[in-house]
A protein has these predicted regions:
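Generic detector of N-terminal low-structure segments
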Residues: 7-11, 59, 165, 177
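Residues in and immediately flanking transmembrane alpha helices
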Residues: 15-16, 84, 183
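Short glycine/proline- and aromatic-enriched beta-strand/turn motifs that initiate or cap beta-hairpins
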Residues: 19-81, 214, 218-220, 224-229
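Short, charged, low-hydrophobicity "junction" segments
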Residues: 44, 89-98, 196-203
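Predominantly the C-terminal beta-signal and adjacent terminal strand-loop region
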Residues: 159-229
């Protein structure tokens, strides 16, 4: 990972040296990430996530075709393979951060087509809470407690982004991007917290279970508008 960030840092420095021949694209659009994650625990099903949100990106390229790209996504995550909440479909939060470099194969006045190798980090968080649930403990008054549970999934991925931009004016344009990634692996944390009254004070008991995540894929189509300068 250190080598990857070193390469990208050097790439950005080189882009500054070629500033006169450098074109930048900044934009935002609607994105629909879909992923499948394997859980390294007996009896646990794979986790399929379908997300809906927004993505912002920067893509810059030199006249010689060298290209760098970075993007950030934030989205609403949905999954029927997570049973944290008392619903058929659980709803959570998803974020993705990716950086990479590659080559722009088409660089005409209006049309730009680039392929970049990308490395990214995904975070998904699902939460649930309830008041006055049954909690049998010797110090719990009335055997009732407030319940909070958080499931966090962190995965690493690498793959390629296929980016196309069409300029509709001097600086304004539309774009589409398809991210195709392999999930290297990751880890999950399932944390449950019970907060209760002992009659003298308020206490909390926290139980956390960790598991490894692995494999499968992430596909993320995006389309929107961009500014070229």
């Amino acid at each position: 990972m250190k080598k990857i960030f070193t390469f990208l840092f050097v790439s950005l420095i080189m882009s500054g040296l070629f500033a006169k021949s450098w074109e930048s694209n900044v934009g935002a659009g609607f994105t629909v990430p879909f992923s499948r994650i394997g859980v390294d625990k007996a009896g646990e099903d794979d986790i399929n996530q379908l997300c809906f949100g927004l993505e912002g990106f920067y893509l810059g390229h030199h006249d010689n075709g060298f290209t760098v790209k970075g993007d950030y996504s934030i989205a609403l995550a949905t999954s029927r393979d997570i049973t944290l909440q008392d619903h058929q479909t659980n709803v959570g939060f998803f974020t993705d951060t990716s950086i990479g470099a590659g080559y722009s194969f088409i660089r005409s006045d209006n049309l730009l087509f680039s392929i970049t190798g990308m490395f990214g980090v995904n975070i998904s968080i699902f939460k649930d809470s309830n008041d006055d649930v049954d909690y049998n403990h010797e110090n719990v008054e009335d055997n009732k407690a407030d319940y909070d549970r958080t499931l966090s999934l962190v995965t690493l991925n690498f793959g390629a982004d296929f980016f196309m931009r069409y300029k509709m004016g001097e600086n304004f344009g539309i774009f589409t991007n398809l991210a195709a990634r392999y999930i290297i692996g990751g880890w999950g944390a399932d944390e449950t917290c019970y907060t209760y009254d002992t009659g003298r004070n308020t206490r909390s008991d926290t139980i956390t279970h960790y598991t490894d995540l692995w494999g499968y894929f992430q596909v993320q189509p995006t389309f929107g508008v961009c500014w070229t300068f």
